[in-house]
Amino acid sequence: MNAPSQERLFDLTRDDDQRMNQDTMQRFATNEIRAVAKDADEAGATPEGFYDKTAELGLSLLPIPEALGGAGMARYPVSNALNAEDLAWGDLALTLGAVTPQAFVNTLLDQGSDAQREQYLPRFCEGTFVAATTALMEPRATFDPMEPQCTATAVANGYSLSGSKCMVPLGESAELVLVIAQLEDQGPAAFIVEGTPEGMTRTREDHMGLRTLELATLAFDNVQLPDDALLGDGSFDLQRFVDLSRLGLCALAVGCCQGVLDYVKEYVNERVAFGEPISNRQAVAFMVADMAIELEAMRLMTWRAASLAEQGLD
């Protein structure tokens, strides 16, 4: 899929690499995600070994430099969105858990220091799943992602972190958490929290359809962090982080909705009433058609946003 230019029209045809990835992702979504999604949701837990299987797809290691053990490939928001869409067709919660470490990796590549990249990124290149996540949302009705109320204060030898984050994916077990907080007298900043330091608590959250995601509320009560926990030099570009996060969620939503539409089409063609499939009823057919129209609009808006992000445009 190509970005628009003055020389050619906007091209929505997937390139060879994207088509190859599509085959891989759709096969994985069918055989490894959808096949276990229902039982996993009812059990409220991810199947054993599932995330290590997703690690074999290499989604997190692809953009990591070769010097750190990765593939050293360029990052393409369009391709990332396509991959997320194809996987989410299988199940939204399992896919979101699988791709959550990508946000951590990409943010480190974007805004981390060389020392932080060298310290953390090689872990993602060992062939096993690394539970890494980002913590942005906060438990209040008026939450504004650009104005976090979780605070960080400079103290001797580091920072003191206080506040709460909610709906953190993989929050129950994540070994690395990128916490967005308001740095005193500076503005929004990001901090890398390893493990569960003193003063940090994790509380599981259960939400319909997301029970396998290990969502949790993370509370920080004067958690002491070292100096090098501050991401980069402290000048965190929160708007870029939020924009790319929203783009990823949009792609996941498109894939999930495509899965719903495919299910509905099969159902209305198989369900028989008064001697014929209910899809023959115009009222039903119109509803399904409206779903397809809205879904295609969602997809095209997401692809356009990904294309703009790939060009560095707003």
Model-derived regions, located:
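A structural signal for short hydrophobic beta-strand segments in well-ordered beta-sheet cores
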Residues: C150-T153
